[in-house]
Amino acid sequence: MFAVPYGALPELGQALRDSIKGKVVIDACNPFPRRDGEIAERAREKGAGLMSAELLPGARIVRAFNAVGADRMGQAHEEPGRVGMPIAGDDEEALDIASTLIREIGYEPVRIGGLEMGKY
């Protein structure tokens, strides 16, 4: 799982290229132009899911944990039922793996589509 400033993804993608190839990577990074600069602008135009796939070549990307705020996540276990966690990805097996992990920590994965749906 990557949960870093979006601007760090180009360097991480290069540094970890061999390590992440073929691995499921849950991408919880959101592009904020004021913080992350030009790469965030590009991600906002293209869509963060598709841009992350370019920046992390060979990884099996699943976008998750970036559409529900931290405050809401922290309150999720105080209420009955499960909070839905939107996830997006193009690899069905990677989505299944991510869904299992998300359920194990108490959320309900909600598949919203492919990486093109993982906009921000």
Regions found by a protein language model. Name each.
Residues 69-71, 116-120:
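A short acidic, often aromatic-flanked loop/helix-cap motif at beta-alpha or helix-coil junctions
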Residues 11, 71-72, 97:
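Phosphate- and divalent-cation-binding pockets in alpha/beta enzyme and binding domains
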Residues 54-61, 78-118:
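Internal alpha-helical scaffold of NAD(P)-dependent oxidoreductase catalytic cores
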Residues 5-8, 67-68, 91-92:
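Short beta->alpha connector loops
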Residues 26-80:
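Glycine-/Pro-rich loop/turn segments that contact NAD(P) or position catalytic residues
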Residues 3-4, 43, 89:
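Conserved residues at beta->alpha junctions
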Residues 1-24, 29-36:
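Rossmann-like NAD(P)-binding element
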Residues 9, 45-49, 95:
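A general structural signal for well-ordered alpha-helical segments in protein cores
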